[in-house]
């Protein structure tokens, strides 16, 4: 039978049809067509027998019984007619084959098996059987052995699920029936007065307990509200305390910062005071130094040489600074200087000298110039020479007075010796000539002695301070 071309309706694989299916008799065909419907009806009758009739009302059972079975429905008639149109029958075969009234069964003559010998008629008859079976179930026939096993497993699983649903439905109906029975029992009006009295007493007791619980609930709600208000108030107090604490800490930090700033300022001020204490104000005010061949006081050159001409205005200003410094030393040291009176007036400073014989005061000009003078022509001297001699005498007397008032006389010795009009052997007199290198060098030595005298005088002034 390998020439048959039927395929599995599920996996579309070729089927090897057994010869017993090809040579089916009419009785065998009727058995195949009616077996599924009868099986379904018998199963439904078995499962839905006594239990359903005990639970389902009679009115619903009548409606269920009036429903037609699948075998009574005309399903697949049009399909069978369509399939039949492809079968070629002989005159004898046409007279033997016809449909019954319900469309689900075939009429077969006794001689059908003997006359139906053609392969096409057999295939057509078998296809009609498969079509009818497919219409009566949810399975498309034919199927192979593998697909058949799969379908059996699936149907078995669905069957078990339906059984579970049925059991659940029965259990639910049973519970409903029990509830209805219990309601009928409790609703029975033949209860005794004692039981009703007990129920009434129990009801009153439950109501009383309910009222007590509601009262306790109200008390608890009030307590909860009170505690919540107290908690909120306490939290606000804590927040306020934290704010105050933060403010205090900020003020404390600011106070510490201010104190530290004041301490730092104090340290800076003390350091500045120490530096000022160590500072010699006289040395800073009168800076005596040298610049080449010239001695300088506050950057003013005292002297002049032929190669470097210094104007008399600068020389006079330097002499004015010398007179101012000597007057300051006399004032701060309180050293006696009865024969001289220093008058610092800048570039026109003068020195007053008392004549011991006549007891008269003479004014000596501590400034000069390049103008022509008759006295310098006849006396061969310059008016500034007397002021320079007076400055030498004042320096010598001040050094002697400082030495007489100190316990270390050797420490007051001047670096350049002063004798009459000479200092370190160089004459301080300018005479009628113009400034020279010798006179400039003598002025330089003069400033050096004044610087030493200033240092000793400053030491004495500092010791005299309280």
From Swiss-Prot:
<dbReference type="InterPro" id="IPR007243">
    <property type="entry name" value="Atg6/Beclin"/>
</dbReference>
<protein>
    <recommendedName>
        <fullName>Vacuolar protein sorting-associated protein 30</fullName>
    </recommendedName>
</protein>
<keyword id="KW-0175">Coiled coil</keyword>
<dbReference type="InterPro" id="IPR041691">
    <property type="entry name" value="Atg6/beclin_CC"/>
</dbReference>
<comment type="subunit">
    <text>Component of the autophagy-specific VPS34 PI3-kinase complex I; and of the VPS34 PI3-kinase complex II.</text>
</comment>
<keyword id="KW-0813">Transport</keyword>
<keyword id="KW-0653">Protein transport</keyword>
<dbReference type="GO" id="GO:0006995">
    <property type="term" value="P:cellular response to nitrogen starvation"/>
</dbReference>
<dbReference type="GO" id="GO:0010008">
    <property type="term" value="C:endosome membrane"/>
</dbReference>
<feature type="compositionally biased region" description="Basic and acidic residues">
    <location>
        <begin position="43"/>
        <end position="53"/>
    </location>
</feature>
<comment type="similarity">
    <text>Belongs to the beclin family.</text>
</comment>
<feature type="region of interest" description="BARA">
    <location>
        <begin position="279"/>
        <end position="463"/>
    </location>
</feature>
<dbReference type="GO" id="GO:0034271">
    <property type="term" value="C:phosphatidylinositol 3-kinase complex, class III, type I"/>
</dbReference>
<dbReference type="Pfam" id="PF17675">
    <property type="entry name" value="APG6_N"/>
</dbReference>
<keyword id="KW-0967">Endosome</keyword>
<keyword id="KW-0926">Vacuole</keyword>
<dbReference type="GO" id="GO:0005774">
    <property type="term" value="C:vacuolar membrane"/>
</dbReference>
<keyword id="KW-0072">Autophagy</keyword>
<dbReference type="GO" id="GO:0034272">
    <property type="term" value="C:phosphatidylinositol 3-kinase complex, class III, type II"/>
</dbReference>
<dbReference type="GO" id="GO:0034045">
    <property type="term" value="C:phagophore assembly site membrane"/>
</dbReference>
<dbReference type="InterPro" id="IPR040455">
    <property type="entry name" value="Atg6_BARA"/>
</dbReference>
<feature type="coiled-coil region">
    <location>
        <begin position="149"/>
        <end position="258"/>
    </location>
</feature>
<dbReference type="GO" id="GO:0015031">
    <property type="term" value="P:protein transport"/>
</dbReference>
<feature type="region of interest" description="Required for membrane-association, autophagic function during starvation and normal autophagosome morphology">
    <location>
        <begin position="439"/>
        <end position="464"/>
    </location>
</feature>
<dbReference type="GO" id="GO:0000423">
    <property type="term" value="P:mitophagy"/>
</dbReference>
<dbReference type="GO" id="GO:0045324">
    <property type="term" value="P:late endosome to vacuole transport"/>
</dbReference>
<keyword id="KW-0472">Membrane</keyword>
<comment type="function">
    <text>Required for cytoplasm to vacuole transport (Cvt), autophagy, nucleophagy, and mitophagy, as a part of the autophagy-specific VPS34 PI3-kinase complex I. This complex is essential to recruit the ATG8-phosphatidylinositol conjugate and the ATG12-ATG5 conjugate to the pre-autophagosomal structure. Also involved in endosome-to-Golgi retrograde transport as part of the VPS34 PI3-kinase complex II.</text>
</comment>
<feature type="region of interest" description="Disordered">
    <location>
        <begin position="35"/>
        <end position="55"/>
    </location>
</feature>
<dbReference type="GO" id="GO:0043548">
    <property type="term" value="F:phosphatidylinositol 3-kinase binding"/>
</dbReference>
<dbReference type="GO" id="GO:0030674">
    <property type="term" value="F:protein-macromolecule adaptor activity"/>
</dbReference>
<dbReference type="InterPro" id="IPR038274">
    <property type="entry name" value="Atg6/Beclin_C_sf"/>
</dbReference>
<dbReference type="Pfam" id="PF04111">
    <property type="entry name" value="APG6"/>
</dbReference>
<dbReference type="GO" id="GO:0000045">
    <property type="term" value="P:autophagosome assembly"/>
</dbReference>
